[in-house]
Amino acid sequence: SLFLNNKIMLTINLTSIGYLSIISENFITRFRMIEYKGAVMRRFASKDSKRDFYILYTLVFGVIAGFIYYQFAGNGKSLVWSHDGIPQHLNSLAYYGRYLREVLHTVFVEHKLELPMWDMNIGYGSDILTTLHYYVIGDPLTLLPVFVPADKTEVLYEILIFLRIYLAGISFSVFCFYHKNPKQATFMGTLIYIFAGWTIYAAMKHPYFSNPMIYLPLVLMGIDKIYKREKPWLFIWATAVSAMSNFYFFYMICIFMFIYAAFRYFGIF
């Protein structure tokens, strides 16, 4: 009986030791995970490197963009608006892709430079430049259709919707970091900037409406650089690209440009 009791006690002790070892291992694992998460957050909050910021931004953007896209695709819908999207924006993008491929063919295959200026297939015949400059000509992102077949233009169209929004967030965050804003505030401000209701609504209906959201922070940052006697190239290039991209939004950018320049001037000097 005594031997049996000792054997039972030994079994209980060994079992207890086993449970304690498992609990301690779980505790150590959780502690290390907490420590790792803390290290990641401290690294994200540090001001030394912004690589972690943009990695996290890209991941969060991908999740939110995927969720938005799923709401359409899951219901059998496309991101191309049935009114202005198909007859104007999508057709202009596909036409511009064919136009660019035709120009490249004449240059590299026929070894001559010919820029078609008139097309009888546009309405009753129209000037190509005056017809397309409002939609695609001048926008650097609309050069991408040259690499995409016409039957795949819809896929590129949907990609460009999110790409413009993504670049708008990059542009806004660069502006915030230039003004020494902390990463956490910049991160939240960037998400609010690119996923506001108007941004999503406008980007789905008229994709190039997102372009001024890319250019404006760079133009304003260029003004700050000039006031600080830094090189003016950012202001010059951002203003030039925004002017070539779309005259309709350029005059709006100019209004904010003058207001911001005056505000910063009296604030600095």
PLM regions: where:
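Alpha-helical transmembrane segments and their immediate interhelical/interface regions
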Residues: 49-54, 58, 77-80, 247-262
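Alpha-helical hydrophobic membrane-insertion segments
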Residues: 58-66, 159, 259-262, 266
